[in-house]
Amino acid sequence: MTASAPITQDVLTLPRKEPEGGKINLVGLTRDRMRAVLIENGTPEKQAKMRVGQIWQWIYQWGVRDFAEMTNLAKAYRAQLEETFEIRIPEVVSKQVSTDGTRKYLVRINGGHEVEVVYIPEDDRGTLCISSQVGCTLTCSFCHTGTQKLVRNLTPAEIIGQVMMARDDLEEWPTPGAPKDETRLLSNIVLMGMGEPLYNFDNVRDAMKIAMDPEGISLSRRRITLSTSGVVPEIARTAEEIGCLLAISFHATTNEVRDVLVPINRRWNIDELLQALADYPKVSNSERITFEYVMLDGVNDSDEDAHRLLDHIKRHNIPAKINLIPFNEWPGAPYKRSSNNRIRAFANIIYQAGYASPIRKTRGDDIMAACGQLKSATERARKSRKQIEAEAGVNNS
């Protein structure tokens, strides 16, 4: 790795060590892993697959956290489960509600770390923006989250637990046996919170497979969007192993500018990224790629930039939508938002070329919940590497 290259996800990714003698958390386990731990702890092997199906529905379809409420299981078996297992999700530390209805949650995970989660209600959908890491390695210069150093990856339980936490707050778990209601307050997930999802690929994949499981939360893969800054080797895996919609934090049309705005571009440049994006819809059956483009005054918002962006997309034959994002300023930000007239002119060039170019409506900026503004309280009390290693049970002496 060269000195100028962004650090990768393995710098502070440490093995997690559960406290000895503690209960096993069933949240975040794959079906196969849940079956294995049930067998290891006394469930007859012939019954294990059926038990997984029953417990899975109670946890992910009905939102039940107490084994005693799982009434299609024998009382003795429920007691056995209670002795060994738990159903634990991240703890809500605080909740802020914007004047536009946006909700920002600060949630605490293992080790006392905190991440932020945002729920955005709209007329036709409700979108939950979730985090995949504590902090971030990418140091994108326009992003507040990028000023917080990476602490660690989130586990599958901590990722899917954000979805479960939001459903708790929205009181959206259905009653067992009640008629199915297709109207959802939480209908979409976007992996656009803290962290780079593709630097935590395996855990993100496992969590999203739980979200998509038809016997649980049951979200269509068309209602899940993963946003990446351009971890090129993992884009193909995302198409094959998750198959969700893909958004790319593009933000610049030349390598010179993107190297500054999105430093991962020094590792995989624009041409390498565009080739990976061109292949994605063929594998995932996605209709199009979303290009996210933050509008920065005098930096990337010229007519020439708009035409270059179109040239990139057309040259690689990428089915695309371009989301233009007015820059959400934060204390100490080195950039200013492009004027409304400049944003509209840029959008019109894209639109006249035949591409959708919606201008994202800023949501939750009064509570620092808007795009690029997330930064948890963990930054104010960030722990040293030795403290993190000690929590993880790693001894490097």
From Swiss-Prot:
Gene3D superfamilies xrefs: 1.10.150.530, Aldolase class I
Listed GO biological process terms: rRNA base methylation; tRNA methylation
Pfam family, one: RlmN_N
CDD domains, alphabetized: Radical_SAM
Binding site for [4Fe-4S] cluster: C136, C140, C143
E.C. number(s) listed in UniProt: 2.1.1.192
GO CC annotations on file: cytoplasm
Cystine pairings recorded for this chain: C129-C371
Residue ranges of every copy of the Radical SAM core domain listed in the record: 122-366
Alphabetically ordered keywords of this record: 4Fe-4S, Cytoplasm, Disulfide bond, Iron, Iron-sulfur, Metal-binding, Methyltransferase, rRNA processing, S-adenosyl-L-methionine, Transferase, tRNA processing
Enzymatic reactions: adenosine(2503) in 23S rRNA + 2 reduced [2Fe-2S]-[ferredoxin] + 2 S-adenosyl-L-methionine = 2-methyladenosine(2503) in 23S rRNA + 5'-deoxyadenosine + L-methionine + 2 oxidized [2Fe-2S]-[ferredoxin] + S-adenosyl-L-homocysteine; adenosine(37) in tRNA + 2 reduced [2Fe-2S]-[ferredoxin] + 2 S-adenosyl-L-methionine = 2-methyladenosine(37) in tRNA + 5'-deoxyadenosine + L-methionine + 2 oxidized [2Fe-2S]-[ferredoxin] + S-adenosyl-L-homocysteine
Co-factor(s): [4Fe-4S] cluster
Compartment(s) of residence: Cytoplasm
Family to which the UniProt record says this protein belongs: Belongs to the radical SAM superfamily. RlmN family.
Further remark: Reaction proceeds by a ping-pong mechanism involving intermediate methylation of a conserved cysteine residue.
Protein name: Dual-specificity RNA methyltransferase RlmN
Species: Ruegeria sp. (strain TM1040) (Silicibacter sp.)
